[in-house]
Amino acid sequence: MIQELDVDGVPTLLAPTGGPMRAGLTFRVGTADETLARSGITHLLEHLALAPLGLADYHVNGATAPVFTTFHMQGSAQDIATFLTSVCANLTDLPTGRLDVEKEILRTEHSSRGTAAVDDIPLWRHGARDFGITSYPEWGLGALTADDLRQWAARWFTRENAVLWIAGKSVPAGLRLALPSGVRQPVPAASSALPQTPAYFVSGSRAVVLDAVVRRRTAASVFAGVLERELYRALRQDGGLSYQTTAGYEPRGDGHATLRALADSLPEKQDAVLGGFVDTLAKLRVGRIEQADLDAVVAKREDFLGTAEVDAARLPSYAFNVLTGERNLTVDEHRAELKAVDVDDVHEVAREALAGALLMVPEGYRADWAGFAAAPTRSAGTVAGTAYREKEGDGELHVGVDGVSWLGHGGPLTVRYAECALMLAWPDGARQLIGDDAISMRIEPTMFDLHPGAIRVIDSQVPAGRQVVMPARDPDRIPQPRAAGGAERREPAKRSWWEIPLMVVSGLAALAIGGANALLTLGMFITETAESDKGWLWGVITVGWLLTVILALPIVLLRRRRR
């Protein structure tokens, strides 16, 4: 049984355990509460709170998720009391002397962290806001100051916005949670960058991934288990197409949950995996759900609910529900809801999941044939403004008072200043604007015939709080036109065998006729000629000069062809 207590004004959850004591202090703040221009502030604050503690004999860690941040430890009661007391002290009096060091550690952490198949999904669904921010680097780190962190801590890391959970016999003696007073913060509203669903996008990953948002309920978590069994059977056991087939269910804190399913593949089997994945989804959508799969998933959950450690294991999710204001079920209530789930309930979840689904497909593939609309990669509109041509290509940049647009092959890209989530600014004048809808536009002054004031116009219109100054780039990394004169120089055309003889014949003929014509013209001016003869002689001279030009023309054209 989970007891609800109070420690220094912080709601506290206590459950017995037969193993080592462990505890966590969880706050209702995460990456979804940040802006892209200040992304990384919660993660940095988490690192600063832990930095002075040094090495520990027991497991100690912190974690920053989209809607919560937690500090947890496993060890003796005394060690846990010391750890959590110190964390709270550091949160109220941040060790900002380590600010630059921890920033570098976070940059190193990001650069050394491998990419996962699902990393880009949040930005495709949500854009460059709230739940989509986890897809981006922590670009805000460089500009964050000690005052920024103190203000963030004062707003989010408070007694009312925290929950303590302990798996052990009792609250450790000497534990003090000296946190400032504040208010419980609501979960941010989730934005959407998808004009219609179901939708799909193309990724460089070899995996096929389903992302869906469903109403949080027991039947939805059961559906995730049924889907995983179906994918395993179809793509691994029967087809031998995938090694990894998984499905998961994660509450979001706002009455909804994220459901994700994944199947990997070899390059030569991507087509078959995509087809098998879609077939499995279609099977569940039309209600072809195996009762045996449903029974197996429910039985597995019931086995977990019957273990001695069930209450201790449920503490983190129980704390999450307290923070987000969602209902916590007792073990008996959870067991009763599991038993009540039937095939019709799972079918209802399948329809809901697929109606709002986002499917990630490998590069070179599509999913419109299965009823999924392509997620937008271009903007629906443009802005009016001064036009600047690309030095290479046919693209055109428009810089206006409302935003910037690029018009070129594939359709326009537009970022309006009022909807700009972030602008990265380099000292050499380059700018990258990212819209709330995740549309990104890079402006390289070296690649456009820009007026010197164009960049200043953009800088003056993007709100200062959304601008991040980037370090200077190596000159070799600044793009340059391929040729200083404009288009790339072409190789001369290969000479044909007949060109030289034609040029020689044309030249000799033009020289002979032109010379004779020159002498005749000169004679007309230095000799007496009867008036009756002048008319036809000048006609002969005119025809002669025209013939000379015609004979010389092949030489001129062939020489121009060689340039």
What are these regions (language model features)?
Residues 162-168, 299-421, 429-434:
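C-terminal regions of mature proteins
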Residues 516-543:
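Membrane interfacial helix motifs at helix-loop boundaries and amphipathic/re-entrant anchors
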